[in-house]
Amino acid sequence: MMRTNYCGQLNSSHVGQEVTLCGWVNRRRDLGGLIFIDMRDREGLVQVFFDPDRQDAFKLASELRNEFCIQLTGVVRARPESQINKDMATGEVEIFANALTIVNRSEALPLDSNQTNTEEARLKFRYLDLRRPEMAQRLKTRARITSFVRRFMDDHGFMDIETPMLTKATPEGARDYLVPSRVHKGKFYALPQSPQLFKQLLMMSGFDRYYQIVKCFRDEDLRADRQPEFTQIDVETSFMTAPQVREVMEQLVRELWLDVKGVDLGDFPVMTFAEAMRRFGSDKPDLRNPLELVDVADLLKDIEFKVFSGPANDAKGRVAAIRVPGGSQLSRKQIDEYGKFIEIYGAKGLAYIKVNERAKGLEGVQSPVAKFLSEDVLSALLDRTAAQDGDILFFGADSAKVVTDALGALRLKLGRDLNLTKNNSWEPLWVVDFPMFEEDGEGGLSAMHHPFTAPRDMLPSELAANPVSAIANAYDMVINGYEVGGGSVRIHSGEMQQTVFRILGITEQEQREKFGFLLDALKYGTPPHAGLAFGLDRLVMLLTGTDNIRDVIAFPKTTAAACLMTEAPSFANPASLEELAIAVVVKGKAAQDGKSENE
C-alpha cells in the first residue's frame, strides 16, 4: 500500500497509529541534531520528526530538500502542550518517522515560495504553482461545487446529456474557434460558444429537464473574469415559466452557498434592467455599495450653465448626481483624478458640490458651478440627494449612455477607494426585463442576449412593427456585481423566430444556411421552454474569494489567449496543413514551413 492516510487529515484521534504517507517536502529544519520536515499533500501539512536513533531514516532525511517527493512510515504521536501549533489543522500531532523513501528528487524550483511570483512565471510552471496550498484548495472547492451541482440537478429530475463539441458556426455574439475538416476539404467545424441550440433541440425531443457541465469557447477580448475556453453549468427546461426557472436556480445557488460558505443568502430581490441602470449605472449592480445615481435633470433645466441645462432639456440626455457621504474631505487632486477616470467612458468633465454647512445655503457649499445655482435650486438638489454636511455631490451631464456608464463606473471606484463597499457581505439579485434589441452602431439592431430569446407579451406582427420597444423575457443572476448566470424563455414559434431573424438583418437565404435545422425543428410541436447557464468559473471565483478567474482554472490561458506552459497556440506541421488543404497567409503572403515571415 503506497499510503494509508493523507497528511492534512491526521489529528489526535490517530495518536498511536502507524501511518504511511506520500507527498512532498514543504520545509526542512535541522534543530540541534534533530531533523523536522513539514510534509505536504493535497489535504495539507503535517510535521514529521526524524530521530538519530533511526539511523537509516535519519541519514536519508539529511538529504531532503524542498519539493522532494517522498514516502514515509511512522507513528502518530501527540505534540507536547507547549509545541502545539494552532495555525495548522494537524498542529496537535506529529509523525515519528521509522522509514523513509525518496521517491524523486527535485531541482531548485523556478518559483519562490517565500515571495510573490509574477503571473507569467506561475502560468509557465503551472504544475508547480498548483502545489501551493491556496491553489490546491481552490481546485478542491471547484470539485466540491461541481459534485454539489450534479447531486442537486439529479435530485430535481434533470438529465445530464452531452452535446457536440464539433458543430456549425452560428452567430452568437463572439468570434468562433474554427476547426478544419480533413474529410470535407475547405469546410470547418466551430467549437461551441454554448450548447444553446442543441439544448433547445433536446427540449423539442422531449427531454424536459436537461443539464450539462460543459466547456464553451469564445474568441473574444479577454479580461480578468474571462477565458477563451470556460465552463458553463448549462440548464434547459420545458413547460416551466421564467419565475419557475428562477425559483429552481435560486434554490440551487442558495443551497450551494450554504454548503460551501455556511451562508444563507435569503430570497433574491428582483430588479428591472431599467431600474438597475437608473440607480446604479449597471445591469449587474453591486448592491454592497451604498452609492446610487439620482436623476436631477428636472431641477437644472432653466439654469444658465449650458453643461447642465443642455442635456437636461435633451430627450436623449441625462443629468444625474452621486452623493458620497463624508466626501467633502476629498482633495482637489483626488477630484481631478476622478474626472480623468470618467473620461474613459466619454465624459467631458466631473462637476461637484462640497457640502460644508448645508444650513448656510450657497455660502455653505464649495463648487465651481455654485455661481450658476439659485438658493432654491441648490436646496432642491440637496433635498433630492439627501446631502448632509461633509458630503460631496458628483454630477454627470451628457447623453444618457455616457452619464450612465461614467457615473456607474465612478460609483464602483468610489466604493472601493473610500471603503464604502461591504466586502464581507453577499448581495444577490435577479435583473429582468432587458431590452430585446440594442443599436449595433451601424444603423441596425443586435440581440441584447441572443436571437433565440422570446419577447414578453408580443405577437410576431407587433414585434416587427416596433422592435425597439420589445422587452426580452430574460433574466440574469447577479452576485456582488458579477453576472454569474443568465437565461431566458426561448422562442418556440417558427414565425416568431423568423421575425427576429429579419429584424436582425438575417436574410431568408442566411436563415436557411445557418439555422435551417432549427427552423425545421420548430415545425414539429415545439414545447415552450426556458433555461439558464451559470459561469462555473465565476461561481468558483466568488466562492474562493479571488478576483481573477485564472486562479480557479487548473490550466488557464493568458489575456492574450496563450498557454505559457505548453506554448499553445503553435504553428501547424506543414504536412498537416497540406492534408487539410490549408495555406497559412501572414501579412498577405503564404507562410513557408508553417512559420511567419517575421520569424
From Swiss-Prot:
It comes from Pectobacterium atrosepticum (strain SCRI 1043 / ATCC BAA-672). Its EC number is 6.1.1.12. Residues 196-199 are annotated as: Aspartate. It catalyses: tRNA(Asp) + L-aspartate + ATP = L-aspartyl-tRNA(Asp) + AMP + diphosphate. It is an enzyme of class 6 (ligase). This is Aspartate--tRNA ligase. It holds the Pfam family tRNA_anti-codon. Transmembrane segments: none annotated. Catalyzes the attachment of L-aspartate to tRNA(Asp) in a two-step reaction: L-aspartate is first activated by ATP to form Asp-AMP and then transferred to the acceptor end of tRNA(Asp).
